[in-house]
Curated annotation (Swiss-Prot):
Top-rank lineage group of the source organism: Bacteria
GO molecular function annotation: ADP binding; ATP binding; phosphotransferase activity, phosphate group as acceptor; protein serine/threonine kinase activity
Methyltransferase in keyword set: no
Pfam (any one): Kinase-PPPase
Protein name: Putative phosphoenolpyruvate synthase regulatory protein
Alphabetized HAMAP family for the sequence: PSRP
Function statement: Bifunctional serine/threonine kinase and phosphorylase involved in the regulation of the phosphoenolpyruvate synthase (PEPS) by catalyzing its phosphorylation/dephosphorylation.
Length: 272
């Protein structure tokens, strides 16, 4: 039986969803129906939310799990009347933090994600634009401005990893797909050689690569197991020969891959 989980916020819901998802991921034997409800910022919206929570409780026969980052005390009290198990993220952590810092919280909605008061905003946008402009080897003449250059076979996870690092940490990451021609030459493309210190390799299990490519080009040579196995074998050999640090992306999330890359390469996050 699935449990229902709500991520409720009077702002975008990013914080409630991120922390809630991380906590629920620790219970991989339990399936969840997950719902994000942003901008619950008036008593009327809160009462409507209570109706949704109670309906889910009646349907499931179990209390929904509620993760909330509601700042307004009145709205929190309305939500607390629901038949749900509430995890109030702000009140759980802010009160002891206020005591430790001997200061009062501003209790501002959406504080961490605001544009005007956040000097990291433009860094984030510039990093995302860099990742998009330098995706899939489309441009190589800006590699001198890159913090990292991810290399690997097509569809091994380079693009989502670059975008995640850009969004979360302001890292300017380019990516370059190693092709069959590169493998036949048994050496790095010239454009990558001069940026060797920025290179990090992604590899992947051949059967997983086959499944991913099959969704894009089914029943093609590109997605065949034999082709995928060949490319992975040759690229891993190239990584060893050129002494390029690398990670197998098969069993890791994009968050884990990104963290491992930054640690391995010693790249500092532009913001945290």
């Amino acid at each position: 039986m699935k449990r229902t989980a709500f991520f409720i916020s009077d702002g975008t819901g990013i914080t409630a969803e991120t922390l809630g998802q991380s906590l629920l991921a620790q219970f991989d034997s339990i399936p969840f129906n997950k719902f994000t409800r942003p901008y619950i910022d008036t008593p009327d919206k809160a009462r409507t939310m209570v109706q949704q929570i109670n309906a889910a409780a009646e349907r499931d026969g179990m209390r929904p799990i509620i993760f909330d980052t509601i700042v307004n005390q009145d709205i929190r009290e309305i939500l607390a009347t629901s038949n749900g198990f509430m995890i109030d993220i702000f009140s759980t952590f802010l009160s002891p933090l206020e005591q430790e810092l001997t200061a009062h919280s501003s209790y501002s909605v959406g504080k961490s994600h605001s544009i005007g008061g956040n000097s990291n905003y433009m860094e984030r946008i510039e990093a995302v634009n860099f990742a998009l402009d330098n995706d899939d080897g489309a441009r190589t003449h800006y590699y001198d401005k890159a913090d990292l250059i991810l290399v690997g076979v097509s569809r091994c996870g380079k693009t989502p990893t670059c975008l995640y690092m850009a969004m979360q940490f302001g890292i300017r990451a380019a990516n370059y797909p190693l092709t069959e021609d590169d493998m036949e030459r048994l050496q790095l493309p010239a454009v990558l050689k001069k940026h060797h210190n920025k290179l990090f390799g992604l590899t992947i299990d051949p059967d997983r690569l086959t499944a991913i490519r099959h969704e894009r080009k089914p029943n093609s040579r590109y997605s065949s197991f034999a082709q995928c196995e060949f490319e992975v074998r040759e690229v891993e050999s190239l990584f060893r020969r050129e002494n390029i640090p690398n990670i197998n992306s098969t069993h890791f999330s994009v968050e884990e891959i990104s963290a491992k890359i930054l640690v391995e390469k010693g790249v500092e996050r532009r913001f945290k």
